[in-house]
């Protein structure tokens, strides 16, 4: 059985917490997660989500207080001898359906498309990985007719940095992530809206501790 505790804090003095417990039952994984809202005033079902997942095949999430299901089905087919990873995602509560596909041309090059059925919006992304160290990802948003750009890379072993820029909103972002079995995982996110006159940066810190039970 595996468990995880996650905490998040930002400069606006907003804080949140979450806990997840997962264990294997044959070839499927069962998972339960709660948030700090579950115990904010008194113990309740607020924030409780139950899930069952078969990696690479399907996952079903059930939000207990909202009585809302989220389904995801995955499959891989081959196109011109290249793997095409497909996903169908449907959220019952807001009646939202997403179709997602990623064509893995080789270990360094991937092309993906994400289509929202209800809105008709489509995003196209190309991902290039250079020598397993640096990844460059331009994304085109068809509805907004705009581009997003992201560059990420590994530094100092367990650490990685990611810089991003959204041309439609003019938001510049920077992430520092560490994934370590010894010290746990944490992420520092900073962003600034270049379209704002004052350009006040936003900063948040997220930490995750993983346990084997």
Curated annotation (Swiss-Prot):
The chain crosses the membrane at residues 2-11, 18-27, 32-41, 55-63, 70-79, 93-102, 108-117, 122-131, 144-155, 159-167, 170-178, 202-211. GO terms for molecular function: porin activity; voltage-gated monoatomic cation channel activity. It is a multi-pass membrane protein. Residues 1, 28-31, 64-69, 103-107, 132-143, 168-169, 212-213 are cytoplasmic. Keywords: Chloroplast, Ion transport, Membrane, Plastid, Plastid outer membrane, Porin, Transmembrane, Transmembrane beta strand, Transport. Residues 12-17, 42-54, 80-92, 118-121, 156-158, 179-201 are chloroplast intermembrane. InterPro entries: OEP24. GO terms for biological process: regulation of monoatomic ion transmembrane transport. It is found in: Plastid, Etioplast membrane; Plastid, Chloroplast outer membrane. High-conductance voltage-dependent solute channel with a slight selectivity for cations transporting triosephosphates, dicarboxylic acids, ATP, inorganic phosphate (Pi), sugars, and positively or negatively charged amino acids. Homooligomers form large rather nonselective pores in plastidial outer membranes. This is Outer envelope pore protein 24, chloroplastic. It comes from Pisum sativum.
């Amino acid at each position: 059985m595996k468990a995880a505790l996650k905490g998040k804090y930002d400069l606006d003095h907003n804080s949140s917490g979450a806990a997840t417990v997962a264990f294997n039952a044959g070839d499927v994984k069962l998972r339960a997660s709660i948030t700090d809202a579950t115990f904010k005033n008194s113990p309740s079902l607020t924030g409780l989500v139950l899930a069952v997942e078969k990696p690479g095949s399907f996952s079903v999430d059930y939000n207990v207080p909202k009585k809302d299901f989220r389904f995801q089905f995955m499959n891989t087919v081959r196109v011109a001898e290249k793997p095409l990873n497909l996903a169908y995602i449907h959220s019952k509560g807001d009646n939202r359906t997403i179709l997602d596909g990623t064509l893995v041309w080789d270990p360094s090059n991937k092309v993906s498309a994400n289509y929202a059925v209800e809105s008709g919006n489509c995003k196209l992304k190309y991902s290039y990985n250079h020598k397993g160290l640096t990844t460059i990802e331009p994304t085109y948003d068809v509805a907004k007719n705009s581009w997003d750009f992201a560059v990420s890379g590994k530094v100092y072993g367990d650490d990685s940095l990611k810089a991003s820029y959204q041309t439609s909103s003019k938001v510049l972002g920077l992430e520092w992530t560490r994934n370590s079995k010894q010290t746990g995982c944490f992420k520092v996110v900073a962003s600034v809206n270049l379209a704002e006159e004052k350009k006040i940066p936003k900063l948040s810190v997220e930490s995750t501790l993983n346990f084997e039970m």
